[in-house]
Amino acid sequence: MSHLTQVQTNIVNEEALKKALNALNIKWQDGPQNIKNLYGQEQTVDILIKQKNNFDIGFVKEELEYKLIADLQYWEQPYTVETFLQQLKQQYAYQIILDETINKGFEKLEEEYDKDGSIRLVVQRWRY
């Protein structure tokens, strides 16, 4: 049966979420915008990801965290929901770490994406 599902993400930082979506080459739009299911049930989202089948997905901030909102029956992304969330959370964590290290005076020297999917980040801070 078609219905909109909310999936907990533990994502709290909007800018890091948007950077993570960009890093995954996922096109998104700022909300508020509505998404709907087959029966016309609608929900307003803060970040919208359009799908070719017009059953868009999005993120809505509830209390302190963003939740993924989607009609999973009409999921049309290159990965499964689980893989999508895994990759999104990895990129989100990477963005949080990178932003925090830059705020503390470090600069990124290099990053490597390993075959196992892990990311190696090298940062440095000069002391005078």
UniProtKB/Swiss-Prot annotation:
Swiss-Prot/TrEMBL keywords: Cyanelle, Plastid
Q: Per the record, what is one GO cellular component?
A: cyanelle
Location in the cell: Plastid, Cyanelle
Q: Which InterPro entries does the record associate with it?
A: Uncharacterised_Ycf35
Top-rank lineage group of the source organism: Eukaryota
Q: Which residues form the signal peptide?
A: none
Tell me which family the UniProt entry assigns to this protein.
Answer: Belongs to the ycf35 family.
**Under what name is this protein listed?**
Uncharacterized protein ycf35
> Origin organism of this chain?
Cyanophora paradoxa
Encoding gene per record: ycf35
